[in-house]
Amino acid sequence: MVDAIQVAELRRFVEQLKLNPSILHDPSLVFFKEYLRSLGAQVPKIEKTERDYEDKAETKPSFSPKHDDDDDDIMESDVELDNSDVVEPDNEPPQPMGDPTAEVTDENRDDAQSEKSKAMEAISDGRFDEAIEHLTKAVMLNPTSAILYATRASVFLKVKKPNAAIRDANVALQFNSDSAKGYKSRGMAKAMLGQWEEAAADLHVASKLDYDEEIGTMLKKVEPNAKRIEEHRRKYQRLRKEKELQRAERERRKQQEAQEREAQAALNDGEVISIHSTSELEAKTKAAKKASRLLILYFTATWCGPCRYMSPLYSNLATQHSRVVFLKVDIDKANDVAASWNISSVPTFCFIRDGKEVDKVVGADKGSLEQKIAQHSSSK
């Protein structure tokens, strides 16, 4: 299942693209732009003015994460990165690739090797475009040779064409998943595009397969940037998690307050409520349970002498304990309620918590009644 937070971030990113399509031309998003093109999408070209280039030269690029508009006061800051060697992505048509289904003869392999030798000579003389031409002929002759694609990728790096290098490195790794040169070229290309985390991942694999000083030097440049981005991401993931917890707590309090208001309206805080039927008692019991209130059910009768003594006290206790629900049942007027509770004498005080009887006081025992109220009203 796709993470809901990631889906929300993607939706916001798409909305930003609708408002400003030029975001796609950020070097760090070249992989996404290539993917869109592979699906047949048309990426709008952005015409740069002379001032645009001046601004770019004057401004140090930085990693600018998207922030969640719903994250209250969380505003993500830019990550300070060393982008001194980041280049503009090359958006030329893909270079020629060989047909992997074509039959390769020994003669083809020999000719391809000859073209590679010419390319290496051209590289040593600094004639990189010529070297690319020779290597292109070589891959057409031997289209399943991983080393030929990886070598051409390394030359594309020398002429600052990271996207072309990535395409060749990908093909090289398709034919040889253990191609150190393929991982190295792709990692260096991604570093040129400012894709620091992906660059670090590829360079680490390359170093494990066949370490050299160039890989080590590149990792020293790439890893600090990748680490800063990862630390930044974790920081804001933690902050968002904290905000989620805060929102959940606010929502819980909001619901609790709503229940309190509902209970206050239904339970007449500070007053004694007379009950006349079992249905009325059930409604009040449910309301008290929903509001996590202690409920006291007082069974009385007009002919009961001790009840006449306890009733004023009961009303006074109701004003003192406004968060306790005080109910009163006249057993002669609501004998069905009294019968359902098996009341045999009055006054009787039943203590109810979460819909269940938890205690009882029988008789005009003022001290016991006050003690039980204090005990059970503070138990939750």
Curated annotation (Swiss-Prot):
Alphabetized GO MF terms: Hsp70 protein binding; identical protein binding; oxidoreductase activity, acting on a sulfur group of donors, disulfide as acceptor; protein dimerization activity
UniProt repeat feature TPR, residue ranges: 112-145, 147-179, 181-213
UniProtKB keywords: Acetylation, Chaperone, Disulfide bond, Electron transport, Redox-active center, Repeat, TPR repeat, Transport
Regions of compositional bias (Acidic residues) in chain numbering: 69-91
Positions of region (Disordered): 49-115, 240-265
Modified residues annotated as N-acetylvaline in this record: 2
Thioredoxin domain sequence ranges: 252-378
Disulfide-bond pairs as recorded: 304-307
Biased composition (Basic and acidic residues): 49-59, 106-115, 240-263
GO BP term (any one): chaperone cofactor-dependent protein refolding
Keyword Repeat annotated: yes
Residues forming the catalytic site: 304 (nucleophile), 307 (nucleophile)
InterPro entries on file: Hip_N (IPR034649), Thioredoxin-like_sf (IPR036249), Thioredoxin_CS (IPR017937), Thioredoxin_domain (IPR013766), TPR-like_helical_dom_sf (IPR011990), TPR_rpt (IPR019734)
Description of the deletion phenotype: High sensitivity to heat shock.
Classification via Gene3D superfamilies: 6.10.250.3420, Glutaredoxin, Tetratricopeptide repeat domain
One of the record's GO cellular component terms: histone deacetylase complex
SMART domains reported in the protein's UniProt record: TPR
Annotated site, Contributes to redox potential value, chain positions: 305-306
Highest taxon, organism lineage: Eukaryota
Subunit structure: Oligomerization under high temperature.
PANTHER family reported in the protein's UniProt record: HSC70-INTERACTING PROTEIN, TPR REPEAT-CONTAINING THIOREDOXIN TDX
Function: Thiol-disulfide oxidoreductase that possesses insulin disulfide bonds reducing activity, disulfide reductase, foldase chaperone and holdase chaperone activities. Heat shock causes oligomerization and formation of high molecular weiht (HMW) complexes with concomitant functional switching from a disulfide reductase and foldase chaperone to a holdase chaperone. May interact with HSP70 proteins through the TPR repeats.
Family recorded in the similarity comment: Belongs to the thioredoxin family.
Protein name: TPR repeat-containing thioredoxin TDX
Organism: Arabidopsis thaliana (Mouse-ear cress)
